[in-house]
């Protein structure tokens, strides 16, 4: 039914609806409508990417907060069950062990049944995808649901497994960004843009870290260091915007949930601000960094060896292939039995959560000095006001419990990384590093009970500062990152130890990077994911090695004047994804690239008159509509390995053709690059 229209009195004759004419306050409503249209026009001038990034940050903060609330409820239920079940050691042992075993079995079985790619950290796979490799199902939305459920069960196990959520949240954020990107392209009808999708995934990786620690700065820098070797400034801005939105919403939700009175740091500390450390202590911080570098290299070596042993052992490999939940349950039973509080768990502070571990380890008081003349009791129930009591035993003392914690957690963390379920491995090594620093600081405070004299002034040593440096240094050594120093400052809200912590992280990285690949690179190697190794150092001769020394000379070219029967023979006898297109068989001048799939489709679409036997050539197929691609990049035989490697990393390339005076003479792919780099680092023995 058509609406009645009228003419507004004194108007120029433009028709208006009677509803608008007789409605209340027509001028105000028209002004509001015009203002909204103006605001919409101004907002969308910025581009929809910024709204996309803000939505991504807010959604991931909601997921992180909801997961924390759900996990906290399950952990409280476990604690209540353990506390109320009675004094029977058997029942208490069963309540302590069966609970995490059931959760881990469900986590492993559920995630693996939905999609096998949901297990593990996810960062190695994301790193591989950002390098341009297509991994099926890793960005599927069903993978998102499986990983959320599995990770929630993993975190609900508490200190028995001692695992975190940083890596999985990076993977979850990337999956959410990919899904939102697909929704956007479907809604506005724009074609899929791989370059734009990659930009969003890079920003999403920063959001994953920011929504776990509420640390936008270190989230962006950590994602840069872990995910890529070259980074665009344009992605830098996007990453900071999305990470800030996610971190702000994450802490805002904590305020709304009455967890905090206002937006504050994640872990509370009370370090001295006036004189946090004396100048001679710089040497001890550097020594702590060196120790963390050595222990980090040992951890990476043992983790990779043990992972290979589990995969090659007949019993464990069969379990992992056929009964992943059974292997997960057995490994969890071992870990839960060790952490049972009345037994060895008494010396591992197993009643503390990971957050409480850090809160206690960052305490600025010296436990060794506090327990010299008095022995604090070990309470039947956990005392939130005296968390450090969990680290004390009258026979073992503080030094014994910390040392026992480091020895046991070293192999327990390695065992936990082999369980096929969604889990993060950054937070455990962060806590482990804090324990290293705490033991180092307690030792110094015991040796220098009055402090170190500098400039006639004596200030007591703060072991909490060394715990902070140890957390940043050890986690930085394992992941080969420097941003862990900034992360330590953001999560504690303290920057008074900026210089010594940074020096410790640099010392740890200098040792670890020269000995072992990072945790994520090692996982890529063990899982046999496609990767391009980095060229370490500047003095290994990468500038002297030329492309002509390692390129693949045996390439199959397609000439425009090649008969169709020859083209068919080439296509059926090879399985390469693309062929170099040359001007003629004689000249071999490279003029383009032909995709195998498109060429096969064009050959199948030809009429019978084009069958083999007729003197038709490839040029006719190309003229009939078979698409070709221009050669935008190519290498020269004189190009150095160093230049070629930088080009591959910068543009996420997988292969390039090599031309000499325009003639196609070879190609270089990741296979040839890996072999050339391997020959530089480990020269073959002379024949």
UniProtKB/Swiss-Prot annotation:
GO MF annotations in UniProt: chloride channel activity; metal ion binding; voltage-gated chloride channel activity
InterPro entries, alphabetized: CBS_dom, CBS_dom_sf, Cl-channel_core, Cl_channel-K, Cl_channel_volt-gated, ClC
Topology, Cytoplasmic side: 1-50, 521-687
The gene coding this protein: CLCNKB
Alphabetic keyword roster: Bartter syndrome, Calcium, CBS domain, Cell membrane, Chloride, Chloride channel, Deafness, Disease variant, Glycoprotein, Ion channel, Ion transport, Membrane, Metal-binding, Repeat, Transmembrane, Transmembrane helix, Transport
Pfam families noted in UniProt: CBS, Voltage_CLC
Further facts: Compared with CLCNKA/BSND, CLCNKB/BSND is more sensitive to pH and less responsive to Ca(2+).
Glycosylation: residue positions: 193
Outcome after substituting residue 560 to M: In BARTS3; decreases channel conductance
Residue stretches making up the CBS domain: 551-609, 626-684
Name under which the protein is recorded: Chloride channel protein ClC-Kb
Family in the record: Belongs to the chloride channel (TC 2.A.49) family. CLCNKB subfamily.
Intramembrane segment boundaries: 116-127, 203-224, 349-360, 464-496
Classification via SUPFAM superfamilies: CBS-domain pair, Clc chloride channel
Taxonomic classification: Eukaryota, Metazoa, Chordata, Craniata, Vertebrata
Catalyzed reactions: chloride(in) = chloride(out); iodide(out) = iodide(in); nitrate(in) = nitrate(out); bromide(in) = bromide(out)
């Amino acid at each position: 039914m058509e609406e009645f229209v009228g003419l507004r009195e004194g108007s120029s004759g433009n028709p208006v609806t009677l509803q608008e004419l007789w409605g209340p306050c027509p001028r105000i409503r028209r002004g509001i409508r015009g203002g909204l249209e103006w605001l919409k026009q101004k907002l969308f001038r910025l581009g929809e990417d910024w709204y996309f990034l803000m939505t991504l940050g807010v959604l991931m903060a909601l997921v992180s907060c909801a997961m924390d609330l759900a996990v906290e409820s399950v952990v409280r239920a476990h604690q209540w069950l353990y506390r109320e079940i009675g004094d029977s050691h058997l029942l208490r042992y069963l309540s302590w062990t069966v609970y995490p075993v059931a959760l881990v079995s469900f986590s492993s079985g559920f995630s693996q049944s939905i999609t096998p790619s949901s297990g593990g950290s996810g960062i190695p796979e994301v790193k591989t995808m950002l390098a341009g490799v297509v991994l099926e199902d890793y960005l599927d939305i069903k993978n998102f649901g499986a990983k959320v459920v599995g990770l929630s069960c993993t975190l609900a196990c508490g200190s028995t497994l001692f695992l975190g959520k940083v890596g999985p949240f990076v993977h979850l954020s990337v999956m959410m960004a990919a899904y939102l990107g697909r929704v956007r392209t479907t809604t506005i009808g724009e074609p899929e843009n791989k370059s734009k999708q990659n930009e969003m995934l890079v920003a999403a990786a920063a959001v994953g870290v920011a929504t776990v620690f509420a640390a936008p700065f270190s989230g962006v820098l950590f994602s840069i260091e872990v995910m890529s070797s070259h980074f665009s400034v344009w992605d830098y801005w996007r990453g900071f915007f999305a990470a800030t939105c996610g971190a702000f919403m994450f802490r805002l939700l904590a305020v709304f949930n009455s967890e905090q009175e206002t937006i504050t740091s994640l872990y509370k500390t009370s370090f001295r601000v006036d004189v946090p450390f004396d100048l001679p202590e710089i040497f001890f911080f550097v020594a702590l960094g060196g120790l963390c570098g050595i222990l980090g290299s040992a951890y990476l070596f043992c983790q990779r060896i043990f992972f290979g042993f589990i995969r090659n052992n007949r019993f464990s490999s069969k379990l992992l292939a056929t009964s992943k939940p059974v292997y997960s349950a057995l490994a969890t039973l071992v870990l839960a039995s060790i952490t049972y509080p009345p037994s060895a768990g008494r010396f591992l502070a197993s009643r503390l959560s990971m957050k409480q571990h850090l809160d206690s380890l960052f305490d600025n008081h010296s436990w060794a000095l506090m327990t010299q003349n008095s022995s604090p009791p070990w309470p039947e129930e956990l005392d939130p006001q005296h968390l450090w009591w969990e680290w004390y035993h009258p026979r073992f003392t503080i030094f014994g419990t910390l040392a026992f914690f480091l020895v046991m957690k070293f192999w327990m963390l390695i065992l936990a990384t082999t369980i096929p379920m969604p889990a993060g491995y950054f937070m455990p090594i962060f806590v482990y590093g804090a324990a290293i620093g705490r033991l180092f600081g307690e030792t110094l405070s015991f040796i220098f009970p009055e402090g170190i004299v500098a400039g006639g002034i004596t200030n007591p040593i703060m072991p909490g500062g060394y715990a902070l440096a140890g957390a940043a240094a050890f986690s930085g050594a394992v992941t080969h990152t420097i941003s862990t120093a900034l992360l330590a400052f953001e999560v504690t809200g303290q920057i008074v130890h900026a210089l010594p912590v940074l020096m410790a992280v640099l010392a740890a990285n200098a040792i670890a990077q020269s000995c072992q690949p990072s945790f994520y690179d090692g996982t890529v190697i063990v899982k046999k994911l496609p990767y391009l190794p980095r060229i370490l150092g500047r003095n290994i001769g990468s500038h002297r090695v030329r492309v002509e020394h390692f390129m693949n000379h045996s390439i199959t070219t397609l000439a425009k004047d090649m008969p169709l029967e020859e083209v068919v023979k080439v296509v059926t006898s090879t399985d390469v994804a693309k062929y170099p297109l040359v001007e003629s068989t004689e000249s071999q001048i490279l003029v383009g690239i032909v995709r195998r799939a498109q060429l096969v489709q064009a050959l199948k679409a030809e009429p019978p008159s084009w069958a083999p036997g007729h003197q038709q050539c490839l040029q006719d197929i190309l003229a009939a509509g078979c698409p070709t691609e221009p050669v935008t990049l190519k290498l020269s035989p004189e190009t150095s390995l160093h230049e070629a490697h930088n080009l591959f990393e910068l543009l996420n390339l997988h292969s390039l053709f090599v031309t000499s005076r325009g003639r196609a003479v070879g190609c270089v792919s990741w296979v040839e690059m890996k072999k050339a780099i391997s020959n530089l680092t480990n020269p073959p023995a002379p024949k």
